[in-house]
Design a protein with these regions (language model features):
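Membrane-helix boundary/juxtamembrane motif in polytopic membrane proteins
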Residues: 90-114, 132, 162-175
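Alpha-helical transmembrane segments and their membrane-interface junctions
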Residues: 113-131, 187-200
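Alpha-helical transmembrane segments and their immediate juxtamembrane interface regions
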Residues: 132-172
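C-terminal ends of transmembrane helices
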Residues: 17-29, 151
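Membrane-interface helix caps and helix-loop-helix hairpins in membrane proteins
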Residues: 26-30, 49-57, 130-134
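Membrane-proximal helix-loop-helix units in multi-pass membrane proteins
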Residues: 51-104
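Structural signature of hydrophobic alpha-helical transmembrane segments
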Residues: 2-15
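Cytoplasmic-side transmembrane-helix entry/capping segments in multi-pass membrane proteins
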Residues: 29-42, 57-66
Length: 201
């Protein structure tokens, strides 16, 4: 393959990201997710001539992994959970900094960040074990089912959420987010090593 499909996919992703970013810039403030998407796709497109040997076979996998990175990074100290930038419009501004509101969104953001990192890990695993491609793909996409159910149902568990200490939980969430970021970095390095050595694909 000449990699043209990968280049076109990146260009389409950049165009979509730029459209969303521009719309949000006009009518509101772009979220960290939208800014990061624009930056990542711009960077990858600019570097395509030098990275095509890596991105052509691994672009989808790396994109999924780094989607997880974007989500997990918003759990780190000084950041606001990514999902809160979208869910806050359902509530009055006075609640946007409420500890319970931020706790719920930290749970959902952490969960989705890990879902994307795990999906990327299943891609790498499948590349190393072609005979497992089908079952691993089933597990990879199957993760979306419980994640979607939790996203819908967890915010409704008001009684359980009130028993949680948001301050203590924040430290655990940040630790788990850090582990996810380390895992994502390791998986990215693995795809680069696989490209350089010619193994897997």
């Amino acid at each position: 393959s000449d990699g043209r499909g990968g280049w076109q996919a990146l260009a389409a992703s950049l165009a979509l990201s730029a459209s969303v970013f521009t719309y949000r810039r006009i009518y509101n403030r772009p979220t960290a997710f939208e800014v990061a998407n624009l930056a990542v796709f711009s960077g990858l497109l600019l570097l395509w001539p030098w990275l095509s040997a890596w991105l052509a076979p691994w672009g989808s996998t790396v994109g999924t992994i780094w989607l997880g990175v974007i989500w997990l990074a918003t759990i780190l100290p000084g950041r606001t959970p990514l999902t809160s930038a979208y869910s806050k419009w359902q509530y009055v501004p006075a609640l946007w900094s409420n500890r319970t509101f931020l706790h719920v969104n930290a749970v959902l953001t952490l969960m989705w960040g890990w879902v994307f990192v795990l999906q990327g890990s299943f891609d790498v695993w499948a590349a190393a074990n072609p005979q497992l491609v089908t079952p691993l793909a089933a597990v990879k996409f199957g993760l979306l089912v419980p994640a979607s159910l939790i996203t819908v149902r967890y915010p409704r568990r008001e009684a359980d959420i009130r028993l949680v200490d948001p301050v203590r939980s924040r430290g655990r969430f940040q630790l788990l987010a850090g582990l996810g970021l380390i895992t994502a970095f390791g998986l990215t390095v693995a795809t680069v090593a696989a490209t350089v050595t010619g193994i897997f694909r």
